[in-house]
């Protein structure tokens, strides 16, 4: 019986902590309207699960804050868009997460929508010459 309890405890622990909020490599599409094409770049962002709960009875004293996997720290990297050299502004800065945590989503710096356009959205299908 103790062996079964251990395995149940172990798998619950693994499900909660091993799938937590971690740095993840993603590919995003970068576009500049003047250049009329997109390129894909690799960056790091936060992804994973955070323990959260939704209260049945809402209390005004205790706010109901849903936690999401979001960045704790990030830096901006800048690159020059290839094929856009004749343009005045061929530089593009993008965020790179360096640390993650479970916390409330900061709408000032993050798209907190449930269904956004996604990181691979591009308004230009192919390069125009």
From Swiss-Prot:
Query: Self-association or partners: how does it assemble?
Result: Heterodimer. The active follitropin is a heterodimer composed of an alpha chain/CGA shared with other hormones and a unique beta chain/FSHB shown here.
Native organism is Monodelphis domestica (Gray short-tailed opossum)
Question: Looking at the keywords, is Iron present?
Answer: no
Q: Which GO terms describe its biological process?
A: follicle-stimulating hormone signaling pathway; G protein-coupled receptor signaling pathway; positive regulation of bone resorption; positive regulation of gene expression; positive regulation of steroid biosynthetic process; regulation of osteoclast differentiation; regulation of signaling receptor activity; Sertoli cell proliferation
One annotated GO molecular function? follicle-stimulating hormone activity
* Annotated localization: Secreted
- Positions of disulphide bridges: 21-69, 35-84, 38-122, 46-100, 50-102, 105-112
Query: What InterPro entries would the database entry show?
Result: Cystine-knot_cytokine (IPR029034), Glyco_hormone_CN (IPR006208), Gonadotropin_bsu (IPR001545), Gonadotropin_bsu_CS (IPR018245)
**Any idea what job this protein has?**
Together with the alpha chain CGA constitutes follitropin, the follicle-stimulating hormone, and provides its biological specificity to the hormone heterodimer. Binds FSHR, a G protein-coupled receptor, on target cells to activate downstream signaling pathways. Follitropin is involved in follicle development and spermatogenesis in reproductive organs.
Give me the glycosylation sites of this protein: 25, 42
- List, alphabetically, the GO terms of the cellular component aspect: cytoplasm; extracellular space; follicle-stimulating hormone complex
Organism domain of life: Eukaryota
**Sorted UniProt keywords:** Disulfide bond, Glycoprotein, Hormone, Secreted, Signal
Keyword Disulfide bond applies: yes
- Into which family does the record put it? Belongs to the glycoprotein hormones subunit beta family.
The record ties this protein, via Pfam families, to: Cys_knot
Under what name is this protein listed? Follitropin subunit beta
Signal sequence residues = 1-20
